[in-house]
């Protein structure tokens, strides 16, 4: 089953975050994303022609995030949007983060 076919499950905490090796294995499924130096977050910078296109993309990401009940941090500027994903309750990465990343990728930039 692909990540886009899965649904984020609520994380109640008390679960260990992925270690670097696990995260790198999951990253293969979302190759445009990068792992931060602490292996606690994944991120991707999307480029656009202008601010309006970037904002439109952010609004579509918001709809996916609400549907999955998993909310990324988003930086927005002229011609770009950077999406940063982690599971805050465990201060690291969980399968949910990669599911959301795959669904964001499916939106197209």
From Swiss-Prot:
It catalyses: (4aS,6R)-4a-hydroxy-L-erythro-5,6,7,8-tetrahydrobiopterin = (6R)-L-erythro-6,7-dihydrobiopterin + H2O. InterPro entries: PCD_sf (IPR036428), Pterin_deHydtase (IPR001533). Coiled coil: none annotated. SUPFAM superfamilies: PCD-like. One of its GO terms (molecular function) is 4-alpha-hydroxytetrahydrobiopterin dehydratase activity. Pfam families: Pterin_4a. This is Putative pterin-4-alpha-carbinolamine dehydratase. It comes from Halorhodospira halophila (strain DSM 244 / SL1) (Ectothiorhodospira halophila (strain DSM 244 / SL1)).
């Amino acid at each position: 089953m692909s990540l886009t076919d899965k649904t984020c499950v609520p994380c109640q905490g008390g679960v260990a975050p992925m270690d670097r090796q696990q995260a790198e294995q999951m990253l293969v499924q979302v190759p445009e994303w990068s792992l931060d130096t602490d292996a606690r977050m994944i991120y991707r910078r999307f480029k656009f022609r202008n601010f309006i296109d970037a904002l439109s993309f952010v609004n579509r990401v918001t709809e996916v995030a609400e549907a999955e009940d998993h909310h990324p941090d988003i930086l927005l500027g002229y011609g770009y949007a950077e999406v940063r994903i982690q599971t805050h309750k465990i201060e690291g990465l969980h399968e949910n983060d990669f599911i959301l990343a795959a669904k964001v990728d499916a939106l197209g930039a």
